[in-house]
């Protein structure tokens, strides 16, 4: 990560290594080249930088990226109303990023209202709230196996 964004420390959302990474890089490059809003930017409700990352993630489902609930613009699907979830593991309905619903094994259940995300996730158990983001109540199941 590079620098603070509105006083917040940057965080790494995803890191991939090993076999298949070169193929993912090619798919990411292709998705970036076909991004339909490269000449457009609107802070709210999108398209914006979060819309771009969600576009890439949908095009490369192997990333299984779970964007944070604070990523306003991730739900902007215009002109489409129905799409895969950004993680590629579920589905999403959205009216111009202003009103929508997302259901996915990776992202959980999310309601989007005026670009703000409300929801919950089961692995790890968490609640998702606007401004606050994600509040985990338990560690991911995958990390429990690391304790053995």
Task: Give residue ranges: language-model regions.
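Non-catalytic ligand/cofactor/substrate-binding and regulatory segments of enzyme domains
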Residues: 1-45, 58-60, 83-148
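Catalytic cysteine-centered active-site loop
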Residues: 42, 62-81
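Solvent-exposed loop/turn segments at secondary-structure junctions
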Residues: 48-49, 72-74, 98-100
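Non-catalytic, well-ordered alpha-helical segments in soluble enzyme domains
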Residues: 50-63
């Amino acid at each position: 990560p590079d620098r603070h964004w509105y006083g917040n420390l940057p965080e790494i959302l995803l890191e991939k290594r090993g076999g298949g990474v070169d193929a993912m890089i090619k798919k990411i490059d292709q998705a970036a080249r076909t991004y339909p809003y490269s000449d457009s930017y609107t802070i709210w409700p999108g398209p914006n930088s979060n819309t771009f990352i969600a576009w890439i993630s949908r095009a490369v489902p192997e990333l299984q990226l779970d964007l944070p609930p604070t990523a306003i613009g991730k739900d902007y699907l215009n002109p489409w109303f129905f799409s895969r979830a950004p993680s590629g593991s579920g589905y999403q309905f959205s009216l111009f990023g202003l009103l929508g619903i997302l259901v996915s094994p990776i992202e959980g259940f999310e309601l989007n209202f005026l670009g703000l995300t409300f929801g919950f996730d089961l692995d790890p158990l968490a609640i998702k709230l606007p401004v606050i983001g994600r509040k985990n109540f338990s560690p991911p199941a995958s990390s429990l196996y690391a304790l053995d």
